[in-house]
């Protein structure tokens, strides 16, 4: 299986956080070019440190290992820390040409889907939005797509791994199904987040 991941960061609307502040958070997106399998995570900022953390996260979140990534030329992806992380994980990194975001069109189109299918829903807090994003991540990986000959990303992954089990990612860590949806209390607050972000895992 080709393991070329398209990665991007999308700012989310300003909403109330668990500590009561109103500010932006950032959606980190990784989509596999071949299967269209997607992984999402929300972080507090668009920084090299969070880009490095997300890169490490997707090495466990995909059922197959991501060996190549394509990013835009944002500062978080051109930072030395991110380059070193790619080298450490033996991930080949490429960036888009300057001023040509369409070069990373697959993830840009997915971001458009998020904008039209998720961000148009009225919510009052980041906690509520992250519940929607988690559910959307799960639903998208199970959605049949014409480009995949009527299969879903999840079905595509399963078939290819059945055909060649050597492609399986030994570091893959599926989430507990009970933890797929973040728990939101009556105030709209989530439980304590880890490293400033709430992950949106999908268990294929």
Residue positions per predicted region:
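Basic, flexible linker segments flanking DNA-binding modules
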Residues: 1-15, 84, 100-101, 155-163
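C-terminal domain-tail junction helix/linker
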Residues: 2-3, 89-91, 113-204
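Hydrophobic "anchor" residues on beta-strands that sit immediately upstream
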Residues: 4, 28, 68
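An active-site-proximal beta-strand-loop segment
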Residues: 7-38
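Active-site beta-loop-alpha junctions of metal-dependent nucleic acid enzymes
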Residues: 23-24, 40-64
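Short small-residue beta-strand/loop micro-motif enriched in glycine and branched aliphatics
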Residues: 37-41, 94-96
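Short catalytic-loop micro-motif centered on adjacent basic/acidic residues
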Residues: 41, 68-72
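RNase H-like two-metal-ion nuclease catalytic core shared by retroviral integrases
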Residues: 71-73, 77-86, 93-116, 127-134, ...
